[in-house]
């Protein structure tokens, strides 16, 4: 019975992969647009590094507290969830910052292509969170 959630989560991750490919294939626009987008991406990466450093320190403490209070299984479950959350957040941020400039370029062609690309870029994070979360929980109990 636990095989079904694992299969669903794998499909979610595969779908996220195809969404990422679609976003990456879209044109990025002019040199100035790309330059601004790179600045936004650098700021986002800097923010995530700082945030993840602080969260990692808290996570290490919580891991040991959970280990002492509830045992290794609960502590490992927390650690797996934290890693899956960090991975989906990082990948989602990278795709979102890539999608920004591509959506701006798509806006030159019309509303339909703009919204289509924006929804694809934004939904990557959702599919990653759902897929990695479900895979982590189901895999943990498999």
Which residue stretches match the model-derived regions?
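Hydrophobic packing and interface segments
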Residues: 1-142
